Amino acid sequence: FIIDGRRLKAINQWYNKRNAFLQSIKDRQHLGYKPTNRQKANTRDRNNKVNDYMNKAARKIIDYCISNDIGTLVAGYNEIFQHSSDIGKVNNQNFVNIPYGQLQSKLEYLCELNGIVFVKQEESYTSKSSFWDRDELPVYNDDNIKTYSFSGIRIHRGMYQCKNGKCLNADVNGALNILRKSNVVSLEGLY
């Protein structure tokens, strides 16, 4: 299943909009660099909402694993994810403020409490390669940058098209490739 992150994006968008408004007032009043009480309250409110969302998302994933007798949870990770990312003013405000590392650490903790094995899997090229066409899943290397070609393409946001024309959700394709890369279970039954 896919957990919808639109609520989290909305929280961040409202926080950034409100903070920009408060900052403009502060700048006009020449109050210096220290955050005002309203800015602190705005940040505290946003952090509480994000923390609540992450706790609920992690709990929902763990409850699903427990109710369906899933003993291993595989999570993709990327070491340089969001570091010095510059994807435009609007996208930076919505995307960079999402704490994926916080969700991963909460999942790791809850897995340990409930006896579920937690596996971190490197996820380079998992969203570009096609799961159904069994594309190669290379590991990204900064020292030796190669250009790879994949059989499928992402036709628009959230939709991935395989070589044979079949379409599937891009997040599902990426998740299946992360699972395939981890070699935790055999996926031959899916092909």
Q: What are the residue ranges of the model-derived segments?
A:
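Positively charged, helix-rich recognition surfaces that bind polyanionic ligands
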Residues: 1-191
